Swiss-Prot record:
Residues annotated as catalytic: 109
One Gene Ontology term of the molecular function aspect: pantothenate kinase activity
GO annotation (BP), single: coenzyme A biosynthetic process
Reactions listed under catalytic activity: (R)-pantothenate + ATP = (R)-4'-phosphopantothenate + ADP + H(+)
Disulfide bonds: none
Entry keyword ATP-binding: yes
Name of this protein: Type III pantothenate kinase
InterPro entries, per the entry: ATPase_NBD, Type_III_PanK
UniProt keyword annotations, A-Z: ATP-binding, Coenzyme A biosynthesis, Cytoplasm, Kinase, Metal-binding, Nucleotide-binding, Potassium, Transferase
Length: 258
């Protein structure tokens, strides 16, 4: 079985693959202060809950956009799993032709999403990932990673309203009854939800205009389903795109690392 870890700024998503099947998956808070022992105890409890042990895991791959956490995670893998993990980063075999000015600047999460997107859906392709930041990745018809856009995530914007506007409350992100809010909470929900729908449709439409072949638009991340339900430009919601990409990259690199 293969253990995959997608470390984001807010949450870490974990998955266990048995062959090509994602058997189990979990979401935990990303904590920069945890030691390798604390992470091991959390993961041990999750594995035990589904009848698994550290010894059931044959390989590990990690994608992270939080560099300070990597030391603890790598030590955890060595100490408890007795496995040296594959880390998504410079030197890893991806198969991507990255056309960024500096390819090393492309975040691990965006690389993993692009690998999975091309494998599952072909090209051209636009991938929208709703995380702490909302990222847009454009892959052309030649399967070249051309770049994209990065915007503040929905939660960041919501928290900024609460923190900077004295009379505005902290709210749940949800679909309001109407675009015209009748109270403060529904007005904020309308502004946040439909504001982001407008952002997605505006950026995606401009990216589509760069391609002579209509690209598929794939959405992933925690709020992808909510945004997609209100948008006409998203073709597919794939909540496990990043985990799939990690599994693919593991297979591309495992022989090289062993």
């Amino acid at each position: 079985m293969i253990f995959v870890l997608d470390v984001g700024n807010t949450n870490t998503v974990l998955g266990v693959y048995d062959g090509d099947e994602l058997k189990h998956h979990w979401r935990i808070e990303t904590s920069r202060g945890k030691t390798e022992d604390e992470y091991a105890m959390t993961i041990k409890a999750l594995l035990n809950h589904v009848g698994l042990q550290f010894s059931d895991i044959d390989g590990i791959i990690i994608s992270s956009v939080v560099p300070p956490i990597m030391f603890a995670l790598e030590r955890m893998c060595l100490k408890y799993f007795h496995i040296k993990p594959i880390i998504v980063g410079p030197g890893i075999k991806t198969g991507l032709n990255i056309k960024y000015d500096n390819p090393r600047e492309v975040g691990a999460d965006r690389i993993v999403n692009a690998v999975a997107g091309i494998h599952l859906y072909g090209s051209p392709l636009i991938i929208v990932d709703f995380g702490t930041a909302t990222t847009y990745c454009y892959i052309n018809e030649h399967k070249q990673y051309m770049g994209g856009a990065i915007a503040p995530g929905i939660m960041i914007s919501t928290e900024a309203l609460f923190a900077r506007a004295a009379k505005l409350p902290r709210i749940e992100i949800a679909r309001p009854d109407d675009i015209i809010g009748k109270n403060t909470v529904s007005a904020m929900q309308a502004g946040i939800l439909y504001g982001y729908v407008g952002q997605v449709e505006g950026i995606v439409s401009r990216m589509k205009a760069k391609s002579s072949v209509p690209p598929k638009v794939i959405a992933t991340g925690g709020l992808a389903s909510l945004i997609a339900s209100e948008s006409s430009v998203i073709d597919i919601v794939d909540p496990f795109l990043t985990l799939t990409g990690l599994k693919i990259l593991y297979e591309k690199n495992v022989d090289k690392k062993q």
